[in-house]
């Protein structure tokens, strides 16, 4: 909420995006990370940031910054097996403060940390309400806005609006561009220092194929050619077996996305998929 102090532990891509959003919503934000380049990046965006590796005690810093009150909330976006992160999050929180885990950390919690301050702890479920709900994600059954304000879709819409309005800067977070053939440079070391966001660059002259040739099947001359639009369950379970039984020649199988058509075309022995 407006005026609250929130600590973001871990200033990677998610941490820096979250810190900017919190600041845009009127929160006082403190960032914590051991990578000085990321600390400097946060500072360049007006975020108070500290590096524990440089001798700064983050718990003491938060206490001093808040006048001994503690942080209203702690957002953990770090990735580490250490249990010390959750302990420090409790220590820097005010009484009845909130801790939200977005990253992956060691969770050997101490009961006293939570009991004495009546802290609340929550694990974030990625995109928001609707995640892992088949009715929402696959069937398009939305939640009423009056009862569920922030769903996956509404969260994404808000982020896109924040980017377009300039209140969220993501372009400056791109630290490297790598050719697709060299993708291992990114995925081989996801935690290298200084790396925040990476872009895979596809060849500019690469040919985009909308029709994929499946095989070199030989067909008997004189028979008609059949094209199929739709590669769903009915086509796979009913239509294709009937055509195969009749030794029909399938010239094309088409689907909206192309991938399902390609898979079914290989199974059915069709010539092309699109």
Model-identified regions with their sequence ranges:
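Conserved acidic E/D residue at the C-terminus of a beta-strand in Rossmann-like folds
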Residues: 33-34, 125, 252-256
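Short acidic-hydrophobic, aromatic-tinged amphipathic segments that line or gate anion-handling sites
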Residues: 48-54, 174-182, 272-274
């Amino acid at each position: 909420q407006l005026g609250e102090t929130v600590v973001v532990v871990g200033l990677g891509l998610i941490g820096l995006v979250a810190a900017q959003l919190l600041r845009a919503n009127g929160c006082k934000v403190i960032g914590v990370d051991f990578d000085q380049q990321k600390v400097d990046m946060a500072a360049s965006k007006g975020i108070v940031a500290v590096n524990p590796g440089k001798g700064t005690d983050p718990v003491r810093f938060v206490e001093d910054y808040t006048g001994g009150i503690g942080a209203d909330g702690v957002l953990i976006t770090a990735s580490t097996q250490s249990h010390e992160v959750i302990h420090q999050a409790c220590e820097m929180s005010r009484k009845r403060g909130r801790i939200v885990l977005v990253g992956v950390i060691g969770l050997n919690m101490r009961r006293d940390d939570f009991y004495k301050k009546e802290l609340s702890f929550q694990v974030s479920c990625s995109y928001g309400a609707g995640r892992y709900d088949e009715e929402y994600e696959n069937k398009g059954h939305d939640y009423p806005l009056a009862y569920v304000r922030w769903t996956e879709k509404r969260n994404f819409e808000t982020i896109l609006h924040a980017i377009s309005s300039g209140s969220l800067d993501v372009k400056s977070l791109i630290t490297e561009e790598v050719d697709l053939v060299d993708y291992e440079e990114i995925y081989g070391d996801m935690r290298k220092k200084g790396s925040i966001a990476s872009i895979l660059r596809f060849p500019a002259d690469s040919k985009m194929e909308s029709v994929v040739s499946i095989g070199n099947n030989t067909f008997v001359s004189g028979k008609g050619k059949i094209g199929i639009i739709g590669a769903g369950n009915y086509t796979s379970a009913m239509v294709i077996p009937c055509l195969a039984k009749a030794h029909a020649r399938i010239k094309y199988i088409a689907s909206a996305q192309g991938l399902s058509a390609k898979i079914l075309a290989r199974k059915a022995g069709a010539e092309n998929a699109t």
